[in-house]
Amino acid sequence: MNKKNNPMIKAAARGMSLLEIMVVITLIGLVTAAVGVAVMNQLEKGQMDTARNQAYEIGKSVELYKLQNAGYPSTAQGLNALANPPKGKPIMERVPQDPWGNDYIYVVPGAKNTNKFDVRSKGPDGVEGSEDDVGNWPEE
């Protein structure tokens, strides 16, 4: 039998079938989706860690304010007292916002730190008092 006229050899020489191409595209799509989900989860975790770290750093600035002013700023004064204290130099140039663009919340005495104060972020949902709030208290 002549190799040029063999239908099996001609089919193999033409390349992949439509079904094979669809399977490869589907597999690429599944891998891309899995990687995308993993990246988004890491992004959210990074934002939560950033918010927690910022809350702790703001808390350290509040402690410094206490040393300079013989007491914590009132809840009414809020965190703006760190940038505009009643006496002395500002402790912070400006108070940062959380990773989601919201202001940090300052409460004295705190709900979590009852003998001190709470500095907290509303978290990714932007709702105060929900489960995703993070602040200057130990993780539960």
Predicted features along the sequence, with ranges:
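Low-complexity, acidic interaction segments enriched in glycine
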Residues: 60-140
